[in-house]
Amino acid sequence: AYENIVLPVVLDNQDIDEDDVNDLLESLQIEHCRDKFPEQMSGGEQQRVAIARALITHPSVIFADEPTGNLDAVSAETVAKMLTLAASKYQQTIVMVTHDRQMAEYADRILTITDGNVTGGVGV
């Protein structure tokens, strides 16, 4: 998982911040996956590795399509809290697609889209 998480940093020819990697592994509860290959991890663990990979470079905008779709309720809540913390800590904007109303509750603004049209919104 480690190589997967740091790949964007390596591709950008940046130095790897080991503290940052360790913080993500711990926050997403995947420390035990550090030396595992994808086939050795559950779907939920793979999803959290993908989220860590998205967060490692601290982009100003994160696009997340069903980021908790393959996770159990506890893991989904952990990921939601991590995304919220990252957005606050690094002043990131997160654009998220979700069908999970509980996950949507973490948002500052919610748009409801039906058949490609905005049909409602909260906090807009």
Label the model's feature ranges.
Residues 2, 34-37:
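Signature (C-motif/LSGGQ) region and adjacent switch/coupling loops
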Residues 2-10:
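Short helical segment in ABC ATPase nucleotide-binding domains corresponding to the A-loop/adjacent helical element
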Residues 16-33:
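Conserved ABC ATPase "signature" region
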Residues 37-41, 45-47:
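Conserved ABC ATPase signature
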Residues 51, 79:
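Hydrophobic anchor residue at the start of the ABC signature
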Residues 62-65:
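Catalytic Walker B motif of ABC-type/P-loop ATPase nucleotide-binding domains
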Residues 73-75:
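Helix N-cap at the start of a conserved alpha-helix in ABC-type nucleotide-binding domains
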